């Protein structure tokens, strides 16, 4: 644990395979301890700032519960809760918070912002999500897959279907490369990840005995998968023309029963970082249905509610894995 002490957690690419495996094993240990009532608080008297430029359910709750379980105090600063970027630079905010807090979580837009916080705060900074990356999510995704499939990480065939450029796709590809997984990214060519990231991940995968395949061929991409993973196709705030174009591009890549069957694996599981547009029972879901006639977007309700779906176990594991990151980088042993 000592080797991660005072480290920031900004992207999985900053960590070795052994370090990521350590965080996942620690997550298992902390989860087990919580379940059987033997958890020992290792963050006593630590003060943690949660800096959110984007609202969240799972990330905020996971950090707050994990910190509480471990004896830490938390201050939540929401989208209107600080002056960062408005009256105060990120560099200045970092130095202010670093003088008062032992650790800082950031969830927002730019990867450069979380990097600046880490550079100038003098305390561990944890990336709760940026437009480019989502490393804490991937720890939960991998832990869930191992728990359900009963396989070593390197033996898991992990497939992401959808927008290959988004933060979750980027983070999953990084994590899979580090862990030596067989990773398929199934997406339209127009939505491929950057060549720079893809080439870097392919090199890392080769070093760790893994493999990365990028394809727009759904049959080829999903065959043999242990995990089918998807994420939302569009984000609120994007212009209407982007929605229309994205929906047309991604409609064939909807995760449905036919796609799950194409894996040829009766034990395949479905993962999603949530929230999901699997029906029209939300305000945004209803707006999408009224405007585009689509009731189910990236995944059908049938798959989302099926036995193959492990999305709520995955959501719970956000808390256990985030706890592991905080304990490993800030804990007292």
Swiss-Prot record:
Q: Give the source species.
A: Staphylococcus aureus (strain Mu50 / ATCC 700699)
Q: Which HAMAP family match?
A: OTCase
- Provide the GO biological process annotations: arginine biosynthetic process via ornithine; citrulline biosynthetic process; L-arginine biosynthetic process
The compartments listed are:
Cytoplasm
What does the similarity note say? Belongs to the aspartate/ornithine carbamoyltransferase superfamily. OTCase family.
Spell out the protein name for this chain. Ornithine carbamoyltransferase
What pathway does the UniProt record associate with this protein?
Answer: Amino-acid biosynthesis; L-arginine biosynthesis; L-arginine from L-ornithine and carbamoyl phosphate: step 1/3
List the catalysed reactions. carbamoyl phosphate + L-ornithine = L-citrulline + phosphate + H(+)
| PROSITE patterns per record | CARBAMOYLTRANSFERASE
Name where it mostly resides. Answer: cytoplasm
């Amino acid at each position: 644990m000592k080797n991660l002490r005072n480290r920031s957690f900004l992207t999985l690419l900053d960590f070795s395979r052994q370090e990521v495996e350590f965080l996942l094993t620690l997550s298992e240990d902390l989860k087990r301890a919580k379940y059987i009532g033997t958890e020992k608080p290792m963050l006593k008297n630590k003060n943690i700032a949660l800096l959110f430029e984007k609202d969240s359910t799972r990330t905020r709750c996971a950090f707050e519960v994990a910190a509480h379980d471990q004896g830490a105090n938390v201050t939540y600063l929401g989208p209107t809760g600080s002056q960062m970027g408005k009256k105060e630079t990120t560099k200045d905010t970092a130095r202010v918070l670093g003088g008062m807090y032992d650790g800082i979580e950031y969830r927002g837009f730019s990867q450069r912002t979380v990097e600046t916080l880490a550079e100038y705060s003098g305390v561990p900074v944890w990336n709760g999500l940026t437009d480019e990356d989502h490393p804490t999510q991937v720890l939960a995704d991998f832990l869930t897959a191992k728990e359900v499939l009963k396989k070593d990480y390197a033996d898991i065939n992990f497939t992401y279907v959808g927008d290959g450029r988004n933060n979750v796709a980027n983070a999953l590809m990084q994590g899979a490369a580090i862990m030596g997984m067989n990773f398929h990214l199934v997406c339209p060519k127009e939505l491929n990840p950057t060549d720079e990231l893809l080439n870097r991940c392919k090199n890392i995968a080769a070093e760790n005995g893994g493999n990365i395949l990028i394809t727009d061929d759904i049959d080829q991409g999903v065959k043999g998968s242990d995990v089918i993973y998807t994420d939302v196709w569009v984000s609120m705030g994007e212009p209407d023309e982007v929605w229309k174009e994205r929906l047309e591009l991604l409609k064939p890549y909807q995760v449905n029963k036919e796609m799950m069957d194409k894996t040829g694996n009766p034990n395949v599981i479905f993962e999603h970082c949530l929230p999901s547009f699997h029906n029209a029972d939300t305000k945004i879901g209803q707006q999408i249905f009224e405007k585009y006639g689509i009731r189910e977007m990236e995944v059908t309700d049938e798959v989302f509610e099926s036995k193959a779906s492990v999305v709520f176990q995955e959501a719970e594991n956000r808390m256990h894995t985030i706890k592991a990151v905080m304990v490993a980088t800030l804990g007292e042993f």
